[in-house]
């Protein structure tokens, strides 16, 4: 049985934490930023923990 390949696009966008959760980054922070408040843009810079239902699908793309 061949080894499962890692989805390279997902590997660049998501990381696994030490506890096994999936860490990602917020959307809506690349353009059209003039109408967004400074507080909102500041919070979008931070990473976030992906929701469990999405993390299940992402973890299939990142087997190793």
Swiss-Prot record:
One of its GO terms (biological process) is translation. InterPro entries: Ribosomal_bL35, Ribosomal_bL35-like, Ribosomal_bL35_CS, Ribosomal_bL35_sf. GO terms for molecular function: structural constituent of ribosome. The keyword Ribosomal protein applies. GO terms for cellular component: cytosolic large ribosomal subunit. The keyword Hydrolase does not apply. It holds the Pfam family Ribosomal_L35p. PROSITE patterns: RIBOSOMAL_L35. Keywords: Ribonucleoprotein, Ribosomal protein. It comes from the Bacteria. NCBIfam families: rpmI_bact. Belongs to the bacterial ribosomal protein bL35 family. This is Large ribosomal subunit protein bL35.
């Amino acid at each position: 049985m061949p080894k499962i390949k890692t989805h390279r696009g997902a590997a660049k966008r998501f990381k696994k934490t030490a506890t096994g959760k999936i860490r990602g980054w917020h959307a809506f922070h690349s353009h059209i930023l003039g109408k967004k408040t400074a507080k909102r843009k500041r919070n979008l810079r931070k990473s976030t923990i992906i929701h469990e239902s999405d993390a299940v699908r992402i973890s299939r793309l990142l087997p190793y």
